[in-house]
A protein has these predicted regions:
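Intrinsic-disorder/low-complexity, polar/charged segments
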Residues: 7, 19-21, 92
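Alpha/beta-hydrolase active-site loop
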Residues: 90-123
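Intrinsic disorder
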Residues: 7, 34, 53, 98, ...
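Short, surface-exposed "cap/lid" segments of acyl-processing enzymes
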Residues: 15, 20-88
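Glycine-centered tight beta-turn/hairpin loop motif at sheet-sheet or coil-to-beta transitions
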Residues: 9-11
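Short, hydrophobic/aromatic-rich segments at coil-to-beta transitions
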Residues: 1-4
Length: 124
């Protein structure tokens, strides 16, 4: 599994994980040209639920069928807890509050376009 960070226009640093091929293959090699799938988790979740069971996981089944799987993480979850200019772990409550002021609108406006642009640049 590969781990990448991408930046949003409003400063969040989010994480995306990639599984370009089945277990035991050299990661990153041969992924170019494969069909890309972005699997985005739902509300109050993270990417881990996508690949939690090797036998029944849709994500791993897609990888085994030849897809280049990318798993997005929403801002402010355990895998995407960074920001370019706001400190997450600060004693200043006004700074911490600003970091946590997030909405689905922001995720749609900033996170998804940045994520798609990142994936498209990586898979050209």
């Amino acid at each position: 599994m590969e781990k990448y960070h991408y930046f949003t226009k409003d400063g969040y640093i989010n994480t995306v994980f990639r599984i370009p091929g089945p277990k035991g293959t050299v990661e990153g090699l041969g992924a170019q040209g494969k069909p890309v799938v972005l699997y985005q988790h739902g509300l109050f979740d993270c990417f881990a639920g996508i690949i939690n069971d090797e036998e029944d996981s849709l994500g791993l089944r897609l990888v085994n069928q030849g897809f280049d799987l990318w798993m997005g993480n929403a801002r402010c979850n355990r895998y995407s807890r960074d920001h370019q200019w706001l400190e997450v772990d600060t004693s200043k409550s006004e700074v911490r509050a600003k970091y946590w002021e997030v909405s689905f609108d922001q995720m749609a406006e900033f996170d998804q376009p940045a994520l798609w642009e990142f994936i498209l640049n990586q898979t050209k």
